[in-house]
Amino acid sequence: METGAGPHPLRLFVCLIPLCLALLLGPGRPGTAEEVILLDSKASQAELGWTALPSTGWEEISGVDEHDRPIRTYQVCNVLEPNQDNWLQTGWISRGRGQRIFVELQFTLRDCSSIPGATGTCKETFNAYYLETETDLGRGRPRLGGNRPRKIDTIAADESFTQGDLGERKMKLNTEVREIGPLSRQGFHLAFQDVGACVALVSVRVYYKQCRATVRGLAAFPATAAESAFSTLVEVAGTCVAHSEGEPSSPPRMHCGADGEWLVPVGRCSCSAGFQEHGDICEACPPGFYKVSPRRPLCSPCPEHSLALENASTFCVCQDTYARSPTDPPSASCTRPPSAPRDLQYSLSRSPLALRLRWLPPADSGGRSDVTYSLLCLRCGRDGPAGACQPCGPRVAFVPRQAGLRERAATLLHLRPGARYTVRVAALNGVSGPAAAAGATYAQVTVSTGPGAPWEEDEIRRDRVEPQSVSLSWREPVPAGAPGTNSTEYEIRYYEKGQSEQTYSTVKTGAPAVTVTNLKPATRYVFQIRAASPGPLWEAQSFSPSIEVQTPGEVAPGSRDQSPAVVVTVVTISALLVLGSVMSVLAIWRRPCDGKGSGNAHDEEELYFHFKVPTRRTFLDPQSCGDPLQAVHLFAKELDAKSVTLEKSLGAGRFGTLCCGCLQLPGRQELPVAVHTLRDGCSDSQRLSFLAEALTLGQFDHSHIVRLEGVVTRGNPLMIVTEYMNLGALDDFLRHHEGELVAAQLMGLLPGLASAMKYLSEMGYVHRGLAARRVLVSSGLLCKISGFGRGPRDRAEAVYTTMSGRSPALWAAPETLQFGHFSSASDVWSFGIVMWEVMAFGERPYWDMSGQDVIKAVEDGFRLPPPRNCPSQLHRLMLECWQKDPSERPRFSQIHSILSKMGQEPEPSKCASTTCLRPPTPLADRAFSTFPSFGSVGAWLEALDLCRYKDNFSAAGYGSLEAVAEMTAQDLGSLGISSTEHRESLLSGISALQTRVLQLQGQGVQV
C-alpha cells in the first residue's frame, strides 16, 4: 500500500509511542456466549490491504502485541490541516449465519489541547460506517462517500492521551463495541471516516453471538445463531444422546437468547432400558444389574435368586428351579413352587356320605404368599392295583371348590358307597406350572366307603308308569363286604319335585322291585333308593342318585279310577266361577271420596268391585330363610358370569363396587345393566346381607321398582345385576335441571312412585330408607324406587350429624327416631319428604339444620313450608303424611289416588308468595331472642369452617346473629369475600338462620 513520501513528524510523535503502550495491554473478553469471529485484524500478520482515500490519510503500520507477535494497525493524524475527510474501507466480510453483528474497536486518541497550533482543526472523534453487499467490492473500486454506507456511530474516546502521558509511558487504550443489523445480504464492508483526529486504530474485531453446542438433560443441542431482535428466542429441538429416549409428549428443547445464552429448557431425555445416566452420557448397566424402564434413573441390583450376565440388561433371569409369575414385576424376587401340604387328615360321614379333608400348609411356600390348593379325586377298584384308578368325574362335588382353594379344608360329596377313592391335595402358587396339580408336590389319602346302594341313575328301570302308580326295579348289589342278597332290604324315598325334601314318603321292600301307588296324575316325582341289612345300619347308608318320573294325566274324565284330588280341583274351580258371577251382580257404583265428604262435579264415576282374585304376593323376609343362597334362586335368575361385561365403575356400594355394564343373554339383544359386586374379604354377615338384598329385590315386579335381571352366585365375585337407570339418583338429577322442569312435570313423577309404595305396602314390605337419593331416573323421566339393601331388623341410624351431612332424621318419622319403630306409616312420612324434595328440585330437607335441631323442631310441631310453585293441595297432602300420630296418616293407596287426580287437573293452584320457600321479607321487626346452635357470629362462622371472615363481618358492623340473619346477597358481596364457594356457603348459612327465625316465631307450618 502506498504510504506517501514519508510520515508526518507530529503523527509519529503522537501515535507510535501510545500504540506500543496499548499493545502491552491485551484485551480481555469475558462472557459465556460463544462468539463467531468474522474479522480480527490482530490475527493477520501480513498487510491488511484495506482501501484508504485519500492516500495521505489513513496509513497502515506494523507493531507487536504483548506476546511479541507482529500485528498490523492503521493511524491518521492530520490535525493541523482543516477540512479533513479521510476514509478507510475494510475488505469484504461474509456474515455467515449471523444477522446481528458486533463490531469491537480498540484505538488511542490524542487530546487536541495537548497539540500546539491545532486549535480549530483538531477533532477528538471519528465515524464508523458499514455497507451491505452481495459480493466483494474489490480493493481498486472503493465506494466511499455519498449516501450508500450506513453510519454505525460517531466514536469518541473515553480517555485521550497528552504529551505528559507520552513521557510517563501511560497507556490510554479505548475499547468500543457497536452493533449492526439485522443484515440480509451475504456480507458487508466496514468504513472509518477521519474528520481531523489524531487516532490510531489498533484492532478491529467483527463477530456474531451464538449459543454454544451443549448437552443438557441428556439431549444434544447444536450451536445456534442468536436472532437479530433482542427479545426473540430461537426454539431449538434437542437430540437424545446415544442409548436415551425422550418423552413423545414433551420432546427436549431449549431456547437460544439474543445474547447467546441458552434459556427455558423444556423436557429431557432418559436413558433407555439397560442404561443409566453418567454425566452427559448413558452407560450400560454392568453385569448383576438391570434397568427395566427409562423411567428409572439408575440400574438396580438383580433381585434374589436371579442374575444378569451381560451388560445393558433390561431384566434378570431366574436361577434354575426358580421362576416368576406372569403377574410379577421384574423387580420381584424369583420364587419356586411350594412343597406338598402337611398332615393331610380325613373323616368320613355316612349320612350323607361325605369325605371331609383338612391339612396344614406346606413347609416351604416357595417364597410366595399366594399359595392355593387343588384337589384331584380318583376312583379305584376295590381289589385292583392303584394304577387302575380313574378320575371321579362330574358326579363328585367339591365344597367349597375343587381348585383355587385358600382354605385348608374341603368336603367331597356324592361319593359312591362300597367304593375306594384316592384324593390328592396339591399345593400351588403363582409359579406352579399348569400340570403342577398332578405333579409330585401333593399329599394323598385313600379311603374306602361303606356298603350301600351302588346304582347309577340308568341302572334303575322304570318298568311301568301310570297316572297314579309307578313301578321300578334294579339289580341286586353284590359288592364284596356288602350285605348278602338274602338279608338285604331296600328303602325307597319319593316326593313331588319342587316340594321340600323334608316332606317325603318311604316304602321298604325285600325284593329289588317296587310299585308305588296313590300318586297324583300329571305330576313329576323324585325317587331315591338305598340298600342295607335290617337293623341300625339303615342310618349309615346313602341313597342312590335321584331319578325323576312324570306320571301321565287321566285318559278320560269319567274314568272310575278318578282320584279324589281331581274331584276337589273341579269342585273348587266351579265354586270360584259361581262366586265371581255373584260378585259381578253385586258390584256397586260409587264416587271416590275427596276427604271432605263432598264429591267433585268433574270427577268421573268409577266402578269398584269388592271381589278380587287372590293373586297378591306376600313378602318373604330373607332373615326367615335358613340358607339365603338357596332361597335367592326361588326369585332370581342365575346368570352366567360370562354374560355380564363390566364397563366402568359408578362408585362404591355397601358391600363392594357399583358398576355399569352389559348383559348379553342368548337370543336377546345386549342390555345395559347396573352390577353390584361383593368385594373380596367380606364377612359372612355381609355376604348374607348381600344375598338378602337380591332376595328382596327379586320378589318385586312393578314398573316403578328397579328390576332385578339376575344374580351370579356360582362365580367370583358374587353379583347382583339390575336394570341400568342412566340419569342417576333423583335428587342429583333435579339439582342439575333446576329451572328446566315446570311444576306439572315434577308432579308427574309422583304418582308412579306412590304406586310402587302402594305395591310394597300391600306385600307387607317396609322400605325404611325412602329418600329422593334412593329413587333412580332413566330416559323419559321414568322414576323407580331402589335402595332395598337395608335389613328388616336394622336399628335406626344415628341422627346426630354435621350440618352438611345426610342425617336420617331428615326423612325419618318421629316414632322411628324415638323408638326405632318402622311401619308402612313411617314410610308414608318419608314419602312426604320425597314429595317435598321433588318440588324443591332436590334441595336438602330442613336446609342446613342439624339432625338434632330437626328432631327438636319436628317434635315442637314444625313442618316444612311449601316449595316455590308448589300447589297448595299437594302441600296439604305432605302435611297429612307428616301427622305425628301414625294412624292419622293416609295409606299409600289413598296417596296414589290423590296424586293421580292432581295430575289430571289443568292448572294446579300455586302457593302464595308469602309462604313460599326462603321468604324474602325482611326480618328486622321480628324478635330474635336466641339461637340454640350458636352463641355468636364467631361460633356460627366456626360451624361453617369460615372463621377467617370474622374480621370482615365485624368491620362491616355485623356483630350479632340478628344482623347476620337480615343480610342479603348484595350485603355479603360488600364484605370483600372473593371466593365464590365461600360466598355460597355463607349464603346457605344465612338462609339457615332465617329458617330458624321462622321456626322460633311460628312462621313455619305447625301441625
Curated annotation (Swiss-Prot):
Protein name: Ephrin type-A receptor 10
Organism name: Mus musculus
Extracellular side: 23-565
Domains (record comment): The protein kinase domain is predicted to be catalytically inactive.
Ranges facing Cytoplasmic side: 587-1007
Transmembrane segments: 566-586
PROSITE patterns membership: EGF_2 (PS01186), EPH_LBD (PS51550), FN3 (PS50853), PROTEIN_KINASE_DOM (PS50011), RECEPTOR_TYR_KIN_V_1 (PS00790), RECEPTOR_TYR_KIN_V_2 (PS00791), SAM_DOMAIN (PS50105)
UniProt domain Eph LBD: residue ranges: 35-216
GO MF: ATP binding; ephrin receptor activity
Positions annotated with a glycan in the UniProt record: N311, N486
Protein kinase domain ranges (all copies): 644-899
Tissue: Expressed in the cochlea, in the organ of Corti, spiral ganglion, and stria vascularis.
